[in-house]
Amino acid sequence: MRLHDLKPAEGSTKKKKRVGRGIGSGHGKTSGRGHKGQNARSGGGVRPGFEGGQMPLTRRIPKRGFTNIFKKEYAIVNVGTLEERFEDGAEITPEVLIEKGIIKDVKDGVKILGDGELTKKLTVKAHKFSQSAVEKIQAVGGKAEVI
């Protein structure tokens, strides 16, 4: 096989549709736009979501809920992740979690959740803990400190 033998796979390449290049091409005269009307015009067409004067779906459906401006968003870490990534007796702080790439940023704080198993004795400093996380950390002799 040589370079001149290479061909793209069957059906993987399509020819560009050249419009307005004579009647014989099949895309001449109106260039596939039909006759007159809004869509035949330059810059014509309706905006997305426009339903021809009928009340649009987005306005037919009732409004629901609101956005709580006081909502706190925590960076969450499970105890199972701490088990995998840290040595026995390690002290874990939000800065260490960012350094190790476990979380991207602290957001409104770090919350430790109780998913997974923990066998190592760790000192964990975070903004919030779930009840199950505290139980698992203390069960193996570790400390859960709220900062």
From Swiss-Prot:
Family per record: Belongs to the universal ribosomal protein uL15 family.
PROSITE patterns, per database record: RIBOSOMAL_L15
Gene3D superfamilies: 3.100.10.10
Compositional bias per record (Gly residues), positions renumbered to this chain: 42-52
Subunit structure: Part of the 50S ribosomal subunit.
GO BP annotations listed: translation
Keyword rRNA-binding: yes
UniProt protein name: Large ribosomal subunit protein uL15
GO cellular component: cytosolic large ribosomal subunit
Keywords, sorted A to Z: Ribonucleoprotein, Ribosomal protein, RNA-binding, rRNA-binding
Keyword ATP-binding listed: no
Region Disordered, annotated ranges: 1-58
InterPro entries documented for this protein: Ribosomal_uL15 (IPR030878), Ribosomal_uL15/eL18 (IPR021131), Ribosomal_uL15/eL18_sf (IPR036227), Ribosomal_uL15_bac-type (IPR005749), Ribosomal_uL15_CS (IPR001196)
A GO molecular function held by the record: structural constituent of ribosome
Signal peptide: none
Entries under SUPFAM superfamilies matching the protein: Ribosomal proteins L15p and L18e (SSF52080)
Known function: Binds to the 23S rRNA.
PANTHER family: 50S RIBOSOMAL PROTEIN L15 (PTHR12934), LARGE RIBOSOMAL SUBUNIT PROTEIN UL15M (PTHR12934:SF11)
Phylogenetic classification of the source organism: Bacteria, Bacillati, Bacillota, Clostridia, Thermoanaerobacterales
